[in-house]
């Protein structure tokens, strides 16, 4: 994996795949909670933030699978002649999904905008390297989560998986994303629905 190419240098073209025709019936800006019987190893026991969902398909970022990587590891590749700031050793990198796992995405609070930033519903998504340098220098967004890779669904695929009870969906919560330990996020999202995951079966319906 080439960490140096994980985020684009500056081009706004290197943002998330273009998807239009969003309607309120889709799950953009919600969490997907993998049901206990989820067999796909890419998504078993995951919590996923839905970046976009429309008639053309869906894109999301898994937000509870930290890798054995830190922001310091990426910065060492991007700026090999500079020692990463000590704070970057404690900034985890998450596996955002099985698609393009050498490509970086930073989900963050909306008070900052960068060279390749897309505004979401009260959140922002950046794919340019400048956000990493800002975080490293202590002038980045107040809240952020860095992933490599993303999850993608073709047109109608996510709807079929929801109908098959592969997922629960629930409203997005910044407290769950940014203030809850990664290993507790999925359970916290389910709890927000009044659901105990260990009691669910494949026959349970989705929210």
Outline where the language-model segments fall.
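A short aromatic-anchored loop/beta-hairpin motif
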Residues: 3, 16-207
């Amino acid at each position: 994996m080439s960490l140096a190419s994980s985020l684009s240098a500056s081009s706004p073209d290197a943002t998330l795949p273009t998807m239009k025709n969003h309607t309120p019936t889709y799950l953009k800006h919600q969490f997907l909670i993998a049901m206990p019987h989820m067999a796909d190893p890419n998504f078993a026991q995951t919590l996923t933030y839905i970046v976009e969902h429309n008639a053309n398909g869906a894109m999301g970022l898994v937000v509870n699978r930290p890798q054995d990587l830190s922001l310091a590891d990426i910065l060492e590749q991007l700026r090999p002649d500079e020692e990463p700031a000590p704070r970057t050793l404690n900034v985890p990198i998450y596996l955002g999904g099985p698609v393009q796992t050498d490509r970086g995405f930073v989900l963050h609070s909306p008070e900052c905008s960068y060279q390749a930033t897309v505004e979401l519903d009260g959140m922002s998504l950046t794919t340019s390297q400048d956000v990493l340098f800002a975080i490293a220098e202590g002038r980045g967004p107040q809240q952020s989560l860095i992933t490599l890779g993303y999850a993608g669904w073709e047109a109608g695929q996510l709807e079929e998986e929801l109908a098959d009870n592969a997922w629960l969906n629930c409203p997005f919560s910044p407290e769950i994303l940014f203030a809850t330990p990664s290993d507790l996020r999925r359970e916290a999202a389910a709890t927000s629905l009044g659901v105990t995951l260990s009691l669910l079966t494949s026959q349970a319906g989705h929210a």
